[in-house]
Amino acid sequence: MDGSGKGNLDQVKHVLLVLSGKGGVGKSTITTELALAFRHAGKKVGILDVDLCGPSIPRMLSVGKPEVHQCDSGWVPVYADPQQQQLALMSIAFLLEDSDEAVIWRGPKKTALIGQFVSDVAWGELDILLVDTPPGTSDEHLAVLENLRKHRVDGAVLVTTPQAVSTGDVRREITFCKKTNLKILGIVENMSGFVCPHCSECSNIFSKGGGEELAKLTGSAFLGSVPLDPLLTESLEEGRDFLQAFPESSTFTAISHIANTLLNSLNA
């Protein structure tokens, strides 16, 4: 496939990277929920899952393990909503024969696959493409940015939890963004409080406000906080649309606020 990268992204209006300095902070959760929120706002959305060693988004969207087909323009993405075709996804999970198979690859092979993902997926018309990256700053991140140079990247959303150990890692992620001239669209504090499944009261089981404080210290925008909600966790495990199922929840309000803030900043 000799896609140029730019050709298959020509009809993509906005590209957002979702980054985290540390694993386990819920980066893929935020990516998934933002994609669903954008779709509910009437946008056509794509997710490029380049977390090669831990591709979890196909399960969160309950797309199973479909075959990836090719057309004249390249790989055809998988749709989480085959009828409406408003939410497209491409992930290495679709290319593995066994879902339990470990991806034990050296940097050059990872870089080559990411290059294919960026250049050879026939997204068609998209309002927003979300790129879900692995934690840290690695070959994968550099490969994504290098392959997206021909296309304008709007910026990055950084995900952290409230604890100092997580915000410390995000500081390094901010340094990475500055060194690579990647605009920071804002910081999301995930797992900010725990929503009781019985009374819906939110209690702080971790420290609180670390993400907002980090945003102030680094001059970044603070997009908002998302609580640790058992209903959200259950929805992701079952591949259900949390935003559609629980529109009365405070977590719905938090995610919708973050999504709307991003849409406004993009003028999307």
Curated annotation (Swiss-Prot):
Tagged with keyword Endoplasmic reticulum: no
Cofactor note: Binds 4 [4Fe-4S] clusters per heterotetramer. Contains two stable clusters in the N-termini of nubp1 and two labile, bridging clusters between subunits of the nubp1-nubp2 heterotetramer.
Chain sites annotated for binding [4Fe-4S] cluster: C196, C199
Entry binding sites for ATP: G21, K22, G23, G24, V25, G26, K27, S28
Superkingdom in the source lineage: Eukaryota
Protein's GO biological process: iron-sulfur cluster assembly
UniProt keyword terms in alphabetical order: 4Fe-4S, ATP-binding, Cytoplasm, Iron, Iron-sulfur, Metal-binding, Nucleotide-binding
One cellular component (GO) term of this entry: cytosol
Names of the cofactor(s): [4Fe-4S] cluster
Subunit comment: Heterotetramer of 2 nubp1 and 2 nubp2 chains.
Protein name: Cytosolic Fe-S cluster assembly factor nubp2
Organism the protein comes from: Danio rerio (Zebrafish)
